[in-house]
Swiss-Prot record:
This is Toll-like receptor 6. Residues 1079-1514 are cytoplasmic. It comes from Drosophila melanogaster (Fruit fly). Residues 242-273, 1473-1514 are annotated as: Disordered. Residues 255-273, 1473-1484 have a biased composition (Low complexity).
Length: 1514
């Protein structure tokens, strides 16, 4: 690379002056690109400061090919991009990488035409993943890159791939589009049809991580050369959307097709053309597939690798892998599979090589599922629910090439000897984490090539002599974490090649005899057992043993001959035992040992144990009881030594080995070291851990000759002061980093010897380490009454103090005389401090028992503390000459008198403390000399009088404390003359209550309330009665003659009883309001549960809307398809059957083929209340669709009443602004609320007619149904063909019982692909079977009798054409008026008067609470689209138990009844359609019923076929 750069540098320098920035598109475009003439990304009204600009290297020019004149042409990369050679340095092809913020978004405009087209064969576009802005690819964006072979676009938040985006890329071989929209759930990625029509030569296509929900039909058909397709990490829900389903194998029968399914048939035929692709690799993992249907990948004849892992697949069809003739690797891991079909690998038996089924819920394993897969090499069944019942001799029969078998994390309890009879090629067998209790003899005998056997984490108790027979090449045996209490001495006799043996985590008490003479053993793990003693011959014959682990046992001593038979032992682990004695020389018998662990034992001395072990490199003796240590105890070759958590008080080096040792890492933390010096640490040390000791002293030059030092831990010790020489090291070269020291957590003292530590990291000379935790270091202040500790980095020079007794400056010449002002002598019983510059001089004489001012206080004293003494007075001129004194503490010293000259000369005094003394009065001139005083503390004295003007000269006074004295008439308003006063304290005095004085006092309190910190406690005293001055009522003052007078009228006392009553009433009223507010929800529920109150309320005009009276349904429920079970089986079951509501459910009752917005609005308008079940599934699926949002907006405008049921956890970040607005303005009920049902009933209107509990009016929901297949159906419609024949129930269930292991059998496929269908043994199941047969036969009869061609119409459509005149006067939800004359009206049928018809061939059993009812007139039936959802009062359903005999053509209409009762049976079928679908616990039957009942509709021409209709409904 360096040679290449040197080669092109002269060319670039020579042509850089002549090169002009130009784009390779058109000249007109060049003129438009001003500031971005050679940049892909241009900004659209956004500055660089608004969005983070991606790193854009400078434009690079590269010589490519030499022109005619010999000058090579240059490759001009855009400013946003950088390039690399695509094939080699000598090839002209270029791979270009561009880092953009976005592509054609609101922030940027993108121009790809500036990319040179001549040599660019690979283009990689990377957007900024942190910017959530929608990008866009324009049509023909890359049309000029005709030579482009590889295109990659990642992290660009694209929403659509248009059909012309890839125009011009005919040579494209590799395409990667990863928008990572999965991180932005609201943004889906859509691909238009024919988007890949131009790129027909595409070989690899990666569309992963795009949040794709659906794909156009046959989108990949044009890619005939495609070999690898990646669709992982999307939101695909149907395998058929990939377009690889082989529809040629699906059974079709044209004679059975209904005319009502013409539209569905056309739609199916349009997509039935299968694509013949040569795909070899397909990855559809991390999607939302639930079912793997038959022939789903049937067209991929050459597919070798199929990855469907990490989906939600729970059912797999019998022929799910049909057509995959070349499939070699199948990954179905991390799904919800419970069982697998028997013939799943029927077509791949001779080709499949790897099958991965781990992390599922497989509990049923067909014995023939994997049999005779003679090419299978790897089978992973781990992390399932497989028991020993499903594994027998036929499970793995014929797997003659299997190499890896993983059965770990299952529930196996035993292994039969014949299970592995054909696995003689198996090399790795994993049985970990099962429940095996024993291993039978010769279980593994057939596996002659097995080299790894994992049996850990089972319940094995004993290993007998024949359990491992036949394992001659076994090298790794893992038996750890079992319950082994013993091993037979001959257990390993056939495992002569065993190298690694794990027996840890068992209950062994001795070293097993079976280990002897295992000459190939390399490692043995006996840790975590109960071994107490080791015999001298325990390891006899283990001459090649490399590692021995005995951690966590109960060993107490090690003898000299314990390890004598282990000459090649290198690693020995004896940690966490109870070893107290080790005989000297015990480890010397193994000359090659390199690492020894003895931590966690009870050793108190190691002298003579390791000194003669020249090969020892690693030694851990931590957590023992060592009290002494010398470097002579370990060999000089030792490199790693751990001594932490012992009782060492010093590190001795009696033999001076600090230069001979090769120790690199030393850990002596958590000991009792008190001092370290240069000899305590070897010179070769690199890492030194001395933390958590008792170190107080670090000698100078301790680290001087440690040239390899990189880190030292000295934190959490007892270091108070540190000399700068203690951390000095030899100069470090520039190319090496300075050593890192950690010294925090020590009780440093801020003395004058440690001020250097604050600036050590800024020292330019490389002779001092870098303190890494300087910000965490605190130091203790020597003399500071405000704070004890301060962060070191915040300390000022005045905080670094040192003590002194006597000091004489160099310029002072009178120190030898007694009277010398420049001599600094600390008074007796005092402590004196100074800083480095002597600008701070502190004299501390507190509590020194002085009775008068101490003599010889230094003249330069800046702070004087004489508090706590026994002064009677402070005489005049006591502080004369101390002109630098700034702080004076004379408090608590029994001072009774101060004079005018006491503080003479203290011009610089700032703080004066005289509190807690016995001062009686202030005469007026005591503080006149203190013109700079800031704070004056006189509280807690006996001051009774203060002369006027005492504080007048204190112009800079800020704090004045006078509380706790005996003041009575001090004119406090004089303090207004002190402009800087911000804190005054006046409480706890004996202020006078005289009216004249008190008035002015109160006035001052009002004006200075912010300054007086104790104004609330200031009070006056009269006749031993205290009255607070700040109180507004009742404060007394006294006249001169002693007559008491209130400052406010006393008439208020007469009103006290009235005030008391008013107060009680006020409190009671607001208590009632507060109680009503707190229990408002409970009161609403109580009122709702009281029938009389609710009847009264809902009968009033305010509660009943006239329009709601005409709405046939009580509530319409919108919800997510994935929450259908919750809505149908819980909400609807309770509201419809138990309470009596009439509900319209979206996925059960609404016409799903109509436009979603119109269908949703129409269904909601048919109900009195709109209810939306809001869950995570609804947010990610339905709410992300525009139709749902627009419908909800329209409903809110019309109704303005929405009830939200919050179901499950709702991610707040995924709730958009519209939904948040609705949640704030609507009624929300949480499913987890313990009063959920009460609140829901309170939110819903009263049900229409409590007697008709199961009666549901669905004219606005079902009237528009078409016979098309439900687009929202999950797994129920995969196997159902359009218009397929439904065999009789007996035939279907007979087929179901033929195969006990099939997941989806043939009868289930014919009936709708429903999965497990048990034989109907219960009454409800038999009734459902009877109902399906009746409806199917009726549909056939209708197809045969009705001769009019065309599409079948619904009741509403027919009513529109035939009864236009009656439509105006008829309500939109009324029963259609064009029914046959004999048919009763919907609301006029009197079921109590209907006769019950019984047939001798059918015995009907009442499954409900009401009796069976049928019509009198056999011809009085209802149309199918109406009667299929009509329920008679009482909600009864019926079950026909006896078989019916039918003759001739009438058998098509023969049901569970005879004679003229056909109309009754039809009505019963409709009744069961409603009752069973809403109340049966088997909710999966609903899509089938929906499919068949949609076929029961009338023909267009009613007049022409009137007689046929009568016959039909007779």
């Amino acid at each position: 690379m360096i040679y290449y750069m040197l080669l092109i540098l002269p060319v670039v320098l020579a042509q850089d002056q002549q090169h002009t920035t130009e784009s390779l598109s058109t000249k007109h475009h060049q003129q438009q690109q001003l500031s971005h003439s050679n940049a892909i990304m241009g900004e659209a009204g956004v500055s660089n400061s608004q969005l983070m600009q991606p790193s854009t290297p400078a434009r690079t020019l590269r010589p490519l090919t030499a022109g005619a004149g010999g000058d090579p042409s240059l490759y001009d990369a855009p400013d946003d991009c950088h390039f690399m050679p695509a094939a080699g340095l000598d090839q002209p092809e270029i791979a270009l990488t561009c880092n953009l913020r976005t592509v054609n978004s609101e922030f940027d405009t993108t121009n790809f035409s500036v990319i040179p087209a001549e040599h660019t064969i690979a283009l990689h576009i990377l957007c900024n993943d942190e910017i959530m802005a929608k990008s866009r690819l324009e049509a023909q964006s890359f049309a000029h890159l005709v030579r482009l072979q590889q295109l990659s676009i990642q992290y660009c938040k694209l929403g659509r791939l248009g059909r012309q985006v890839l125009d011009g890329l005919e040579q494209l071989r590799n395409l990667t589009l990863r928008t990572h929209n999965i991180l932005w759930p609201a943004l889906n990625f859509e691909i238009e049809a024919d988007a890949f029509s131009v790129t027909r030569r595409l070989e690899r296509l990666d569309l992963s991580s795009n949040n794709i929900w659906s794909l156009p039909d046959n989108i990949f058909c044009t890619l005939s050369e495609l070999s690898a397709l990646n669709m992982s990490e999307n939101r695909l829900q149907d395998v058929n959307e990939l377009g690889f389903r082989d529809r040629s194998k699906e059974p079709t029968n044209g004679s059975t097709e209904s005319t009502s399914t013409t539209e569905s048939a056309k739609k199916s035929s349009s997509s039935s053309t299968s694509c013949s692709l040569d795909l070899e690799y397909l990855d559809v993992s991390h999607n939302d597939f639930v079912v793997l249907p038959a022939n789903g990948f049937g067209t991929l004849r050459r597919l070798r690798v199929l990855s469907v892992n990490n989906n939600g697949i729970s059912m797999i069809a019998d022929k799910a892998l049909s057509g995959l003739k070349n499939l070699q690797i199948l990954n179905l891991s991390s799904n919800k599979i419970v069982a697998l079909p028997t013939e799943l690998f029927a077509e791949q038996a001779k080709i499949i090589q790897e099958v991965y089924l781990q992390n599922n819920s497989i509990s049923v394993l067909n014995p023939q599922l994997f049999s005779n897969l003679d090419q299978l090499q790897a089978l992973d069944l781990s992390m399932n629910q497989i028991t020993s019942t499903w594994i027998d001799k036929n499970t793995f029969v014929g797997l003659i090439r299997l190499v890896l078998l993983n059965l770990s994390h299952n529930k196996l309890t035993k292994l039969e000897p014949e299970i592995f009879s054909d696995l003689y090629t198996l090399q790795i067998l994993n049985l970990r984490h099962n429940q095996l209790e024993n291993i039978a003899a010769d279980t593994f005998a057939p596996m002659n090539n097995l080299h790894t056997l994992l049996l850990s984490h089972n319940k094995l108790k004993y290993l007998d002599a024949y359990a491992l027979n036949g394992l001659y090449v076994l090298s790794l045996l893992s038996l750890d974490n079992n319950a082994l209490i013993g091993v037979h001495p001959d257990a390993f006799r056939n495992c002569s090649a065993l190298q690694d043996l794990n027996l840890n985590g068992n209950q062994l008490k001795t070293v097993p005899l079976a280990l002897r003479n295992m000459r190939h053993l390399r490692t043995v793990d006996l840790g975590e057992n109960m071994i107490t003693v080791m015999e001298d011959s325990a390891f006899k014959g283990l001459g090649n043993l490399y590692g021995l682990r005995l951690i966590g046992n109960y060993l107490e001593n090690i003898t000299m001959h314990t390890f004598r038979d282990l000459p090649n032992l290198q690693i020995l682990n004896l940690a966490r035992n109870r070893i107290a004695v080790v005989e000297p020389g015990a480890f010397e018998m193994t000359s090659s040992i390199q690492a020894v662990r003895l931590d966690g034992n009870e050793l108190n001395d190691i002298n003579g144990l390791f000194s003669n072990m020249p090969s020892l490199l690693w030694l851990n003796i931590s957590d023992n009881r060592l009290e002494s240590f010398d470097y002579g105890h370990v060999p000089s070759t030792l490199q790693w030594l751990d001594l932490h958590k012992n009782r060492l008080s010093s590190l001795s080096n009696r033999f001076g080995l600090d230069s001979e040792l090769k120790l690199q890492t030393l850990d002596v933390s958590f000991n009792q070291l008190q001092r370290i010096g240069p000899s305590s640490i070897p010179n070769s040390i690199e890492l030194l851990f001395l933390n958590d000791n008792l170190i107080t002293t670090v000698d100078p030059d301790t680290f001087m000759h440690k040239t390899n030092l990189t880190r030292v831990d000295l934190y959490a010790n007892q270091i108070t002061t540190l000399d700068i020489k203690s951390l000095r090291i030899l100069p470090v070269w520039e190319h090496r980093a300075l050593p890192e020291f950690y010294i925090g957590g020590n009780p440093f003292t801020c003395d004058c010897n440690i001020d250097w530590l604050q600036k050590i990291n800024h020292i330019t000379s490389r002779q001092y380490p870098r303190i890494m935790d300087l910000e965490t270091i605190y130091c203790k202040l020597l003399n500071n009454r405000e704070r004890a500790y301060i962060p070191l980095i915040e300390a000022e020079p005045k905080h670094f103090l040192c003590t002194y007794k006597t000091h004489c400056f160099a310029v002072c010449h009178c120190c030898e005389f007694d009277a010398c002002d420049c001599e600094m002598t600390c008074p007796t019983n005092c402590t004196c401090f100074h800083d480095q510059t002597w600008s701070t001089n502190i004299v501390e004489c507190s509590g020194a028992a002085y009775s008068e001012m101490p003599r010889r206080v230094p003249m330069d004293t800046s702070e004087l503390y004489i508090d706590g003494n026994n002064f009677v007075e402070l005489a005049g001129h006591s502080f004369l000459g101390r002109k630098n004194l700034a702080v004076l503490y004379a408090n608590n010293s029994n001072v009774a008198h101060i004079y005018n000259t006491t503080f003479s000369g203290l011009k610089r005094l700032l703080i004066l403390h005289l509190e807690d003394n016995h001062i009686i009065s202030l005469e007026g001139n005591e503080f006149h000399n203190l013109e700079n005083l800031r704070e004056l503390y006189l509280q807690s004295n006996k001051i009774a009088s203060i002369a006027n003007g005492s504080f007048q000269m204190l112009r800079k006074l800020e704090v004045l404390r006078l509380d706790g004295n005996r003041l009575m008439h001090f004119e406090v308003w004089q303090l207004s003359a002190n402009p800087y006063l911000v804190e005054i304290s006046l409480a706890d005095n004996q202020w006078s209550c005289e009216c004249g004085y008190l008035a002015r006092f109160r006035n001052y309190l009002g004006q200075s309330s912010e300054k007086i910190i104790d104004a609330s406690r200031v009070s006056c005293i009269y006749n031993n009665a205290t009255s607070v001055l700040r109180e507004k009522n009742g404060t007394k003052c006294t006249l001169r003659d002693g007559v008491a007078h209130y400052m406010h009228t006393n008439e208020i006392e007469g009103l006290l009883p009235l005030l008391l009553v008013a107060t009680c009433a006020f409190v009671a009223f607001f208590g009632l309001i507060f109680g009503l507010f707190c229990y408002r929800h409970e009161l609403k529920i109580w009122a709702h549960s009281t029938n009389c109150l609710m009847n009264f309320c809902y009968k009033s005009p305010r509660f009943v809307d006239q329009l709601d009276k005409e709405r046939p349904n009580d509530a319409y429920f919108a919800y997510s398809l994935q929450d259908e079970h919750f809505v149908n089986q819980i909400l609807a079951q309770t509201l419809e059957n138990d309470i009596g509501y009439r509900l319209c459910l979206h996925y059960r009752d609404v016409n799903i083929n109509a436009y979603i917005t119109d269908a949703l609005i129409e269904a909601a308008e048919s109900a009195k209340q709109f209810v939306l079940v809001l869950s995570k599934n609804f947010l990610y699926n339905e709410w992300s669709r525009f139709e749902y949002k627009s419908a909800l907006h329209e409903l809110v405008k019309r109704r303005k009443r929405v009830v939200f049921i919050l179901y499950g956890d709702l991610p707040q970040r995924d709730i958009d602004m519209d939904m948040r607005h609705y949640l704030r303005t609507s009624t929300c009920i949480e499913w987890d609320d313990k009063k959920f049902w009460q609140k829901l009933r309170l939110a819903l209107p009263l049900p229409n007619g409590r007697g008709n509990n199961n009666k549901r009016v669905v004219s606005g929901c079902l009237s528009g149904r078409t016979p098309s297949v439900n687009m929202y159906a999950t797994s129920h419609e995969y196997q159902a063909g359009n218009g397929g024949v439904i065999p009789p129930p007996s035939a279907r269930y007979a087929d179901c019982g033929s195969n006990n292991y099939a997941t989806i059998n043939e009868c289930a496929a014919a009936g709708g692909g429903r999965g497990y269908k048990p034989i109907p043994t219960s009454a409800s199941a038999a009734a459902a079977a009877c109902k399906f047969n009746t409806m199917n036969q009726l549909s056939k009869k209708q197809q045969r009798d009705l001769s009019v061609a065309g599409m079948a119409k619904t009741l509403e459509h027919q009513h529109h054409h035939n009864h236009q005149a009656n439509r105006r006067s008829q309500h939109e939800y009324a029963v259609p008026s064009y029914l046959p004359s004999a048919a009763p009206a919907y609301d006029s049928v009197d079921y109590a008067k209907q006769q019950i018809r019984n047939n001798a061939n059918c015995e009907c059993v009442n499954l409900g609470t009401a009796k069976r009812a049928a019509g009198k007139n056999p011809a009085s039936g209802l149309p199918s689209s109406f009667s299929s959802n009509f329920v008679p009062p009482g909600g009864a359903s019926y079950n026909c138990k006896k078989s019916c005999s039918c003759i001739g053509d009438d058998e098509l209409l023969c049901s569970c009844g005879g004679g003229g009762g056909i109309g009754v049976n039809l009505l019963e079928s409709g009744t069961q359609s409603s009752v069973t679908m809403s109340s049966s616990s088997n909710n999966s039957r609903q899509p089938e019923l929906t499919h068949y009942e949609s076929n029961l509709s009338l023909n267009d021409d009613e007049d022409e076929d009137h007689d046929q209709q009568k016959n039909l409904w007779a």
